[in-house]
UniProtKB/Swiss-Prot annotation:
Task performed by this protein: Binds directly to 23S ribosomal RNA and is necessary for the in vitro assembly process of the 50S ribosomal subunit. It is not involved in the protein synthesizing functions of that subunit.
Protein's recorded name: Large ribosomal subunit protein bL20
Domain of life: Bacteria
A GO-annotated cellular component: ribosome
Keywords, alphabetical: Ribonucleoprotein, Ribosomal protein, RNA-binding, rRNA-binding
InterPro entries, A to Z: Ribosomal_bL20 (IPR005813), RIBOSOMAL_L20_CS (IPR049946), Ribosomal_protein_bL20_C (IPR035566)
Length: 119
């Protein structure tokens, strides 16, 4: 069996990791051993935060809808309940955009929700 020297493979692996660590501070971008740890940790953060991003945006949308609906005299939960009773199906992302950029339309939605709750 011929002898296998791993120089080419090792260099390729090192280059790959150091390329991923480009832009990191200090030894994290220059030293392979430290760069491996930094890239691994960055990957863990990226994986975790891709999931947290969805939760955080939903929280933001709810906060915006709540603030806008309270300005019109209705709490968030009662507003959403009123929309469901009025069979208005608009998701929270669009509701938040309407609340921020088109206050007149949002006010009419609140009125429709109030009417549905009164019935």
């Amino acid at each position: 069996m011929p002898r296998v020297k791993r120089g080419v493979t090792a260099r390729a692996r090192h280059k790959k990791v150091l390329k991923l660590a480009k832009g990191y501070y200090g030894a994290r971008s220059r030293t392979y051993r430290v760069a491996v740890q930094a890239v691994t940790k960055a990957g863990q953060y990226a994986y975790r935060d891709r999931r947290q991003k969805k939760r955080q945006f939903r929280q933001l949308w709810i906060a915006r809808i709540n603030a806008a609906s309270r300005q019109n005299g209705l709490s968030y939960s009662r507003f959403i309940n009123g929309l469901k009773k009025a069979s208005i199906e608009i998701d929270r992302k669009i509701l938040a955009d309407i609340a921020v950029f088109d206050k007149v339309v949002f006010t009419t939605l609140v009125e429709k929700a109030k009417e549905a709750l009164a019935k």
